[in-house]
Amino acid sequence: MHATYLALLALCQTPEARFFDQRIAPILTKRCLGCHNYELSDGGIAFDNRDSLLKKGLHGPAITPGKPEQSYLLEAVRHKGDVKMPPGLPLPSKEIKLLRKWILNGAQWGSKLRN
């Protein structure tokens, strides 16, 4: 029954929501959600919901849908500005390209993220 529900849910999703669930959610969950979530919103930003990414954090909104080069998230994950996230090395270029594509296409959300 659970598999049937998931199959029906996948059919009802928009392509943008499917892209988020399959490509973006794993990146945000693995790279961001541990420190930036509802309970621990380091830097004033939580990655567990779209609204938080759109509102002003300590450095402004994390994303500007349709405008990846104006999105603070991309600057941070590329390690180009003052804030370098996640700590350590920048994200792999493949992940940065996926995030850029997601933002360029409107940064639509899919299923709720869980850490």
Regions found by a protein language model. Give the residues of each.
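Sec-dependent signal peptide recognition
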Residues: 1-8
